[in-house]
Amino acid sequence: MGFNEQHAIKHVVIDEAQDYSLVQYQIASNVFKSAKITLLGDLNQSIMPFVNYTSYEPIIKMFLRDRARDKEETQYLTKTYRSTVEINNFARKLMVNQAYYREQVERHGDQVEIIQDHETGEKSKMVQDAVEFKKRFGTVAIIYKTKKECKELQKALAKTKYAKDFLYMIDGECNFSTDKVMVMPLYTAKGLEFDAVLVAGCNEDNYNSETKKLFYVACTRAMNHLSLYYDDIPSSLVL
């Protein structure tokens, strides 16, 4: 396979480094052979099923080999500033790789809420809570695991009094609002942060030991308040 090397580019920054395969990194290494490489990532936030690193060593060794070097500079950002102590303590239990636990800033807030909600549409407690949170917080998001679930909520609220209160980021829209509750699937929420987050569908069949990293990503979008909603059997991860 041939590659057009990009010698004009001197430095490449790769964000979300935990989500790229070694094949993709090999291509990047070949294309940007003369460039310096900076990797930014969190191994606990890997959501790609074909990638499961336990460390960055395989990636680093490949870049060093291709550049005929024997050492790299690694800096670990060991303090997290995003979330409150209460949210961070909850999220820590979800971390697959505890070796990468980060020190947290001592900023306290609400306890994490775990709520059973059998209702749907405008009768849903989650929907009512989200509207109330908008009066208290700047940015509020409802995070579903899938796009299908987001569309179901959109349809359920379309002709209700709450229709104007919600903004949907489902099919790649780049809308972002501080005036409305944002509704999005987990893969869209990745990399974003909100004052208050409501995670929907926290049932055992949605979030379990096999999908712990996905749940970790959803929960760590919250800065000040985190509410978790389930309708039947709660995920063992929330207990």
Predicted regions located by residue number:
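Conserved helicase motor core of SF1/SF2 NTP-dependent helicases
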Residues: 3-7, 11, 18-239
